């Protein structure tokens, strides 16, 4: 087995995430409100293409943060202020941190380009994580495709419980 070519860390690429957010704002796909920046899902007509979810079927709060700062309940966070004990970085929107989905888009662009062949992950990442990656990456990079092929694996379970680091 060979060692990986790259082992990027999200915390070392926050500058690229800030650049991507700025590009999305400039192109009209994102907006700032009270030091938060959100991706406006309704602006991306193909949202839901991977998960086969219709925009009107999305329920506010389903693994997404419900906030009065959003224009629409389905909009997802690109940048938010950090809480007192959380890591934070300086940005045009104040001290804060990037949203969960942005790190993958920024690092894949740096190491794989605007479009690449294969993207994978667990089936639990199809929505919202991979769906949001597609939206923000395609809109920021002006591409018709983010990844050509998607591979999603099921889980290993023990006593009907998902086996994962997050489970302990």
Regions found by a protein language model. Name each.
Residues 15-168:
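Alpha-helical recognition segments enriched in aromatics with Gly/Pro capping
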Residues 1-10:
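Divalent metal-dependent hydrolysis catalytic cores, especially in the metallo-beta-lactamase
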């Amino acid at each position: 087995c060979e060692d990986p070519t790259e082992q990027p860390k999200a915390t070392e690429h926050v500058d690229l995430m800030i650049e991507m957010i700025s590009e999305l704002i400039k192109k009209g796909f994102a907006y700032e409100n009270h030091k938060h920046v959100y991706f406006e899902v309704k602006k991306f007509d193909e949202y839901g293409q991977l998960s086969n979810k219709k925009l009107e079927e999305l329920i506010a709060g389903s693994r997404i943060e419900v906030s009065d700062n959003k224009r629409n309940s389905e909009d997802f966070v690109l940048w938010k202020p950090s809480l007192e004990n959380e890591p934070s970085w300086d940005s045009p929107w104040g001290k804060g941190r990037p949203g969960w989905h942005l790190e993958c888009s920024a690092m894949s662009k740096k190491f794989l380009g605007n479009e690449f062949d294969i993207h994978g992950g667990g089936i639990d990442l199809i929505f919202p994580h991979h769906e949001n990656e597609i939206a923000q990456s395609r809109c920021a990079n002006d591409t018709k495709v983010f990844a050509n092929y998607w591979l999603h694996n099921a889980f290993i379970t023990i006593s009907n419980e998902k086996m994962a680091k997050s489970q302990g």
